[in-house]
Amino acid sequence: RRAVSLWREDAHRWADTAGAEGAVVERLAVRVRGPLSLLAGLWLPGGERVLGDHGARRDVAESYLEGLQDALPRLRRATGAGRLGVVVDEPWAAAVLAGTLPTASGYRTVRSLPREEARGLWRAALDGLTALPDVARVWLAPGRRAASPGAELPGPAALATLTGESLPRPDAAADAPVPAPVSLVVGVGALDDGADGTPGTREAWEAAAGWADIGRGLTLAPEPGVRPVDVVRTWERLGVDPGRVG
């Protein structure tokens, strides 16, 4: 209840400030924690992570979707935004899938979440969000935050591929690719001529290029220090139209 109260206070303060400034909000982007990372960050009364309990995972996932479907329309009304864009942020996605998150004792790790269950959680969240008339676009942003130094996580390309399998497929009957309401966010590093960059960089670029080639929604997220011009040059070198990426 306290969290809901604070959230509503923030929304009203934002609306009051925009009203005082005479600002007209045509588009508003909202970042929400994704279902996998939410499960990783919640704890049961006994002290263990919700992630390790199948029944608790199911209950939280249902409440999560209900909460978003209630909160987002409220936010749009409070702010007067013409359209909402929602970023589903999954910083712990790779750690959840790799089973590297520690238990409460710290001596063991929570078992990895089955891939099919992860895909199901993402599909349910994305389907619920895109069904809302208040939401114009959704981005799914999987991350590779490690719970401990040296933890082995799925590579950027593998994570992008797994996440992408959860996204809605474009209409195969369409004459031309139409921007999907859901886009996959792929992190990319520097890729100079004749060099592969950091480990996994080339694979991430190739996964992104393949995604764009089949007309799927895609947004590139350059790593710190990577200039936008480098992203465009690499994209062109891979033979993909820069207009296909956000």
Range-by-range predicted roles:
Residues 8-18, 65, 69-76, 119-126, ...:
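Generic structural signal for well-ordered alpha-helices
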Residues 167-169, 175-246:
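Catalytic-face loop-and-helix region of soluble metabolic enzyme cores
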Residues 16, 20-23, 77-81, 127, ...:
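Secondary-structure boundary motif
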Residues 63, 67-203:
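Active-site loop segments of alpha/beta catalytic cores
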Residues 26-28, 82-85, 136, 243-245:
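Residue-level recognition of the N-termini of beta-strands and the immediately preceding loop/turn
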Residues 1-70, 74, 97-113, 117:
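Active-site-proximal, glycine-rich beta->alpha crossover segments in alpha/beta enzymes
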Residues 32, 88-90, 222:
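Short glycine-centered, acidic/aromatic-flanked micro-motifs in structured strand/loop junctions
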